[in-house]
C-alpha cells in the first residue's frame, strides 16, 4: 500500500458572512485562488501530474453548484486534463476529500491530488432551500436537523455547564488572537483579494472574525439562542458564521521524493462513524476510536488535538468522552471555529492544516483532527510527521 503524504496546506483568511470582506467575492474565486497558490508555492510540481481536484462543499447550489471543484479549477487555469469532483459529507466535506484522495493514492489510483473545500455562508446560507422529508421523523428525533438543539442535548448528557461553555468560547478567541499576534497563522493564510467597508478592493491578510475583546464574563451576558427558556448554548459559544476556503497538496511519498518536495506529514489513520442524529456532535468520539485502532495507536499517543468547535458544548462533550480533559494544553492551541467560524465545506482541511502547522511549531510527531457532522456522523484523521 502506498504511503500518503501532505506537502502543503493553505487557506484564505476567514471573512465575516454578514457584510464581510468577501461579500463581493464568489466561492469559486476563493477556491481558484488557493488552487493557483498551491502551484505557486510548489513550482517543482507539473500541474499535468495532478490526477484529480477533490473539493468539499455543502450547499451545492447557486454559485456553489454544478460541481464547484471543476468550475474553480477551470477558473484557476489548471490543465483541462485534470479531473474535478465536489464531495459532500456536510461539516466533514473537505476532510472527506482528503480521505478520498488518500484512499486513491494508497490503492494506486493516482499519485497527486489537490484537495480542499469552500463555503460562502454569506451568499448561500446553511438553511437555504433545506427541505427534510417529514417521514424522517419516524426514525429520528424531530429536532435532529437543528444543530444548536443537538448541542444543548449533548451538553446536558455530559454535564457541560454554561460557565464551562463561556470559558471555552472566550479561550477560542483569545488563543486565535494570540496566534495572530505571534504569526502562527502566517504559513497557512494566503492573502486574498476582498473589499473593505467602503467597497474598495483590498488585500485581506488576516482573519476578520476573531474578537480579541471576548471574555467569559462578556459571553455570560448573552441569552441562549436555541432553547431560550432552559438552554445554555449562545451565539458566543457557537461557531461563527464565516466565508472561506482551504486547500492541501496530497501525494504519494514516492512522488514527493521524485519531485524533491518535502513531505510535512503522512496519513497514519482515518475513519468515519455514525451516531444518533439527536446528539450529532458526539460523532468525533467513535470516529476517533476507529481511526486510532486502524493506526495502531491509543489516545495517549496523541500529542496535539484539533476538535472542530461547532459548539462549545459539543467540543467539550467530546473532550470529556475521550477522557482528555487533562490535556487542554494540547487541544486547539490556536483557537477554533468559535473564533474563526465554520465555513462548512472548508473546515475539514482547515483544521487539518492548522494542526499540521502546530505539530511543526510544537515539534511533536502525532496529531489528531476530528469533527462532528450534521445528522449524526463523525470523521477523524491521525497525522504523523515525517
Swiss-Prot record:
Coarse class of the protein's main subcellular location: cytoplasm
Keyword annotations: Acyltransferase, Cytoplasm, Fatty acid metabolism, Lipid degradation, Lipid metabolism, Transferase
Pathway annotation from the record: Lipid metabolism; fatty acid beta-oxidation
EC number per UniProt: 2.3.1.16
Keyword Acyltransferase: yes
Active site: 91 (acyl-thioester intermediate), 342 (proton acceptor), 372 (proton acceptor)
Localisation: Cytoplasm
GO cellular component: cytoplasm
Similarity comment: Belongs to the thiolase-like superfamily. Thiolase family.
NCBIfam families, sorted: AcCoA-C-Actrans, fadA, PRK08947.1
Chain's role: Catalyzes the final step of fatty acid oxidation in which acetyl-CoA is released and the CoA ester of a fatty acid two carbons shorter is formed.
The name this protein goes by in its record: 3-ketoacyl-CoA thiolase
Gene (UniProt): fadA
Amino acid at each position: 500500500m502506498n504511503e500518503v503524504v501532505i506537502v502543503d496546506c493553505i487557506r484564505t483568511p476567514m471573512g465575516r458572512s454578514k457584510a464581510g470582506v468577501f461579500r463581493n467575492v464568489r466561492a469559486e474565486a476563493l477556491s481558484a485562488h488557493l488552487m493557483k497558490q498551491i502551484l505557486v508555492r510548489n513550482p517543482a510540481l507539473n500541474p499535468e501530474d495532478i490526477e484529480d481536484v477533490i473539493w468539499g462543499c455543502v450547499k451545492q447550489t447557486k454559485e456553489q453548484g454544478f460541481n464547484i471543484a471543476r468550475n474553480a479549477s477551470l477558473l484557476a487555469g489548471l490543465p483541462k486534463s485534470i479531473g474535478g469532483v465536489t464531495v459532500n459529507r456536510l461539516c466533514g466535506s473537505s476532510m472527506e476529500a482528503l480521505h478520498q484522495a488518500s484512499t486513491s493514492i494508497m490503492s494506486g489510483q493516482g499519485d497527486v491530488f489537490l484537495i480542499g473545500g469552500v463555503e460562502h455562508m454569506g451568499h448561500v446560507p446553511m438553511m437555504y432551500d433545506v427541505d427534510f422529508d417529514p417521514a424522517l421523523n419516524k426514525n429520528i428525533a424531530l429536532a435532529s436537523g437543528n444543530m444548536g438543539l443537538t448541542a444543548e442535548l449533548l451538553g446536558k448528557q455530559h454535564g457541560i455547564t454554561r460557565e464551562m461553555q463561556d470559558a471555552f468560547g472566550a479561550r477560542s478567541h483569545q488563543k486565535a488572537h494570540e496566534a495572530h499576534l505571534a504569526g502562527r497563522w502566517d504559513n497557512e493564510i494566503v492573502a486574498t483579494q476582498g473589499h473593505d467597508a467602503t467597497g474598495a478592493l483590498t488585500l485581506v491578510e488576516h482573519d476578520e472574525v476573531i474578537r480579541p475583546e471576548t471574555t467569559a464574563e462578556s459571553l455570560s451576558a448573552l441569552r441562549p439562542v436555541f432553547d431560550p427558556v432552559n438552554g445554555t448554548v449562545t451565539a458566543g459559544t457557537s461557531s461563527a458564521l464565516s466565508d472561506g476556503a482551504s486547500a492541501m497538496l496530497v501525494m504519494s511519498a514516492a512522488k514527493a521524493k521524485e519531485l524533491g518536495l518535502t513531505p510535512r506529514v503522512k496519513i497514519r489513520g482515518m475513519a468515519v462513524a455514525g451516531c444518533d442524529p439527536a446528539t450529532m456532535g458526539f460523532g468525533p468520539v467513535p470516529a476517533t476510536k476507529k481511526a486510532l485502532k486502524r493506526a495502531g495507536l491509543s489516545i495517549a499517543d496523541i500529542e496535539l488535538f484539533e476538535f472542530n468547535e461547532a459548539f462549545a458544548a459539543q467540543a467539550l462533550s467530546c473532550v470529556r468522552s475521550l477522557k482528555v480533559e487533562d490535556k487542554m494544553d494540547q487541544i486547539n492551541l490556536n483557537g477554533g471555529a468559535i473564533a474563526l467560524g465554520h465555513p462548512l465545506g472548508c473546515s475539514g482541511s482547515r483544521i487539518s492544516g492548522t494542526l499540521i502547522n502546530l505539530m511543526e511549531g510544537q515539534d511533536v510527531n502525532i496529531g489528531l483532527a476530528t469533527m462532528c457532522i450534521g445528522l449524526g456522523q463523525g470523521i477523524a484523521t491521525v497525522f504523523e510527521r515525517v
